[in-house]
Structures are given as C-alpha cells and as structure tokens.
C-alpha cells in the first residue's frame, strides 16, 4: 500500500497495486446470484476525488461495470448514502488493465473512511486482489463482497482489491 501527497494536481493518494488472486463480480451462468465486490479505505489526506481505478484480470464479454462511492462507518460496518456513481462499458480489451471510473468530483476528508462497490448486471469480471497474511492484514481498509441472494455482507481485512484512489489536493 502506498500513500503519496502532491500539490494541487490529480494524483494517486492511495493505491494497493499488489495482486496474487482475483475476485469475480457479475452474474455467473451457473447460478441465480449476482456477485458484488468493494473496498473500504481510510482517506490519507483532504482532497477532491475525481477517479478510482481497479485492476481487471479478465472480462468474460462486453457489458456494464458500475461503481458507487459511499461514506463508510467501519465500527458498524454500515454503507452510507451514495456520494457519486459511474457506469462504464468494459470488454475483453480491458483484460489485465487498470480500468478508470471517472467520478463527479467529491470532497474527501483525511482519516475518514469511505468505500466503493462494484457490480455488473450483464457480464462477469475478475478484479485483481491481494491475499494478505492473517497476522499482517491490509492496514487501510477491508475488502467487501456479497451477492443478491444471501443478503449478507462479508468483510475481509486479509484481502484487498487492487485499486487506486486519485485525489486533487
């Protein structure tokens, strides 16, 4: 995990680049569930969020990928209202690439916890993730996943999506 402070230009303020496995989101043909994923993070500085990137390992076929940004209450594990959202189109050319989600500018505050959720109604996408040691979990947030059948959220400190949070200071 890397945090960097720059001047007044867009920069990756928080990034987790390591990946040694993947998490599938979207709809698998083998069952009725839609799989969702996300990542919580503690913001390292004040700034205007303009872009989040995630690393895609595979895209099964062309479709939509939707990202929503939320405030997150880490004590109660509660997702707040949507602060910003964006829907992009992905296809096989996005395989093994950083996919950008350009967001309407949102002011984030240092040390507050936020989170983003990813879903797809019509394709299956493998998002890069890192598996950490249970004795040395990811320090800046938790990976989240769920499906539309169970109505149960799962949070993991020892997993993290591969992501970049870009801020303008």
Q: What does each model-found stretch correspond to?
A:
Residues 80-92:
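Solvent-exposed serine/threonine-rich low-complexity stretches and specific carbohydrate-binding patches
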């Amino acid at each position: 995990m890397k945090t960097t402070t720059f001047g007044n230009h867009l920069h990756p303020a928080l990034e987790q680049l390591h990946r040694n496995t993947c998490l599938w989101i979207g709809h698998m043909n083998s069952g009725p569930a839609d799989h969702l994923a996300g990542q919580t993070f503690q913001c390292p500085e004040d700034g205007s969020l303009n872009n989040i990137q995630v690393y895609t390992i595979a895209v099964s076929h062309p479709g939509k990928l939707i990202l929503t940004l939320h405030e997150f209450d880490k004590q109660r594990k509660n997702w707040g209202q949507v602060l910003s959202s964006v829907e992009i189109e992905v296809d096989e050319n996005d395989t093994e690439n950083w996919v950008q989600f350009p967001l309407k500018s949102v002011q984030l505050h240092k040390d507050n916890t936020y989170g983003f959720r990813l879903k797809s109604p019509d394709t299956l996408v493998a998002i890069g993730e890192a598996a950490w040691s249970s004795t040395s979990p990811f320090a800046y947030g938790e990976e989240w996943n769920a499906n539309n059948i169970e109505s149960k959220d799962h949070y993991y400190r020892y997993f993290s999506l591969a992501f970049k949070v870009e801020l303008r200071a």
